[in-house]
Regions:
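Glycine-rich phosphate/adenosyl-contacting loop at the front of the ribokinase-like
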Residues: 1-56, 64-66, 239, 310-311
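Short beta-strand scaffold segments in enzyme catalytic cores
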Residues: 44, 91-93, 226-230
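Gly/Ala-rich phosphate-binding loop of Rossmann-like dinucleotide-binding domains
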Residues: 47, 156, 264
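Conserved phosphate/ATP/ADP-binding segment of small-molecule kinases
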Residues: 145-234
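Conserved phosphate-binding/catalytic region of the ribokinase-like
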Residues: 172, 200-311
Length: 311
């Protein structure tokens, strides 16, 4: 079974506005609830695709209850540790006129040492049935900076593949524990390597440094430029799909979901890349974070290109 861990859980409430102006009452033309938190997003996406998973992490309050109910409605098993405060509620604002989006968030979830101990204990039990682990997102207030590296190390000690997606110090510390796969974006590549990353060639050079240094596979996402995948000795460029994006929230997490399916089933990485980017394309077409129509994903499966890189 695929196991996902989201320490700083959240739910996204997305508003579509004709245009955005400060200082005025703005009326949305559409609103949608979606999942939030990278690993939980992946679990929600997997559930809609019919792939079972176990979602873990910390949760609290009414928003935490809503999040668990949303996951369970997709057939996802849940085992969240009840923490303090409230699971985050993110407000995502999508502006139809400018094609830009912004996210309003606040750190409302708090954990104590006993909560962390509970999560570690439950996680170790979950590893008994895990075929792949997805870890992702930020860390809540009170969580130790070493949490991700500890969880990664425990899974790797059992030869369970780990997909890891975070940012900042959490990403750097987790990377040192050598997960199997990470998915840095353009800014994260630059931060991790200290290199300027503007072009695909820049991204390839930075990703190659990380692959050599940490022995990790990478999918480097470069927005409208597409993505690069460095999976062992196989290096690919994935051109962007032709999609009229409604919202980008959750699309990257769909890539994690696709790769987890391939790793869990011991399929070739190419199968995971095709599924992941097809799911991502479908997510782009939907306002709610990490939501999609399976028929869109099936259609995009035939359109995903894996081009050898360097060409």
């Amino acid at each position: 079974m695929i196991v996902t861990v989201t320490p700083n859980t959240c739910v996204d409430y997305t508003l579509l506005l004709p245009e955005f102006r400060l200082g005025e009452t703005l009326r949305a033309t559409e609103a949608a609830w979606g999942m939030g938190g990278k690993a939980a997003d992946a679990a929600w996406i997997l559930g809609r695709w019919g792939v079972p998973s176990l979602a873990m992490g910390f949760a609290a309050g009414q928003i935490g209850q809503r999040m668990e109910a949303m996951l369970q409605a997709r057939g996802v098993a849940t085992d969240f540790v009840e923490a303090e405060g409230e699971t985050r509620l993110n407000v995502v604002v999508v502006c139809a006129k400018s094609k830009q989006q912004s996210t309003l968030t606040a750190n409302t979830l708090r954990v104590r040492a006993e909560h962390v101990d509970q999560l570690r204990s439950r996680y170790m039990r979950a590893l008994d049935q895990a075929s792949c682990v997805i870890l992702g997102g930020s860390l809540p207030e009170g969580a130790p900076h070493s949490l991700y590296s500890d969880l990664i190390g425990a899974a790797r000690a059992r030869n369970i593949p780990v997909i890891f997606d975070s940012s900042g110090s959490a990403l750097r510390m987790g990377l040192a524990a050598r997960p199997q796969l990470i998915k840095p974006n353009q800014a994260e590549l630059a931060e991790l390597t200290g290199q300027v990353v503007k072009s695909l060639e820049d991204a390839y050079q930075a990703a190659s440094v990380l692959q050599r240094t940490f022995g990790v596979d990478l999918i480097a996402t470069m927005g409208e430029q597409g993505a690069l995948a460095l999976i062992g000795q196989k290096h690919y460029y994935i051109p962007p799909l032709r999609v009229e994006a409604v919202s980008t929230a959750g699309a990257g997490d769909a890539i994690l979901a696709g790769m987890a399916v391939a790793l869990s089933r011991r399929e070739p990485p190419e199968a995971g890349l095709r599924l992941g980017f097809a799911l991502a394309g479908a997510v782009l077409r939907t306002l709610a974070t990490a939501d999609y129509q399976p028929e869109d994903a099936r259609r995009f499966l035939e359109q995903v290109q894996l081009l050898p890189w360097p060409s």
